[in-house]
């Protein structure tokens, strides 16, 4: 299975390493040609506006939408979640519009407010998983087709709808492969 990681910014190397440890074939996705070679895609963290501009300028936005709408599994972590959301609070911009959620950017504050915690995410694991939040967004609304997978302090931080998975946190920065394993079976 060829698992792509949008390789513009964010935890690219860490995602690639997790995929490799699970015997997937990691692919750095930097172009439309790379996008055509993959079976599924991870959109990592970083700065959502910058990544969105990269997708538009590289003419990847519409082909990416078409692949996702056609059923290709996709997982957005942090900024990736913002890019996949239908709506971003206090913004008229949306990018991929692949999951019926509304997100709040930097909902947990600035870089100094970043934190680590643990949570049980029953759909993923029978054990608590480490969660790393860095200037993290969270979900303020989910549509009827969306299932909340995890909440922290009453805020939704992981959700799924069909072939689309989103997390506010960064599983690639934890020493745990369970989230990546779950995505690779999606």
Swiss-Prot record:
EC identifiers of the protein: 4.3.3.6, 3.5.1.2
Gene Ontology CC: cytosol; glutaminase complex
Catalysis performed (reactions): aldehydo-D-ribose 5-phosphate + D-glyceraldehyde 3-phosphate + L-glutamine = pyridoxal 5'-phosphate + L-glutamate + phosphate + 3 H2O + H(+); L-glutamine + H2O = L-glutamate + NH4(+)
GO molecular function: glutaminase activity; pyridoxal 5'-phosphate synthase (glutamine hydrolysing) activity
Keyword Lyase: yes
Membrane spanning stretches: none
InterPro entries associated with the record: Class_I_gatase-like, PdxT/SNO, PdxT/SNO_CS
Active site: 78, 170, 172
Subunit-level organization: In the presence of PdxS, forms a dodecamer of heterodimers. Only shows activity in the heterodimer.
The family this protein is said to belong to: Belongs to the glutaminase PdxT/SNO family.
Protein name: Pyridoxal 5'-phosphate synthase subunit PdxT
Gene: pdxT
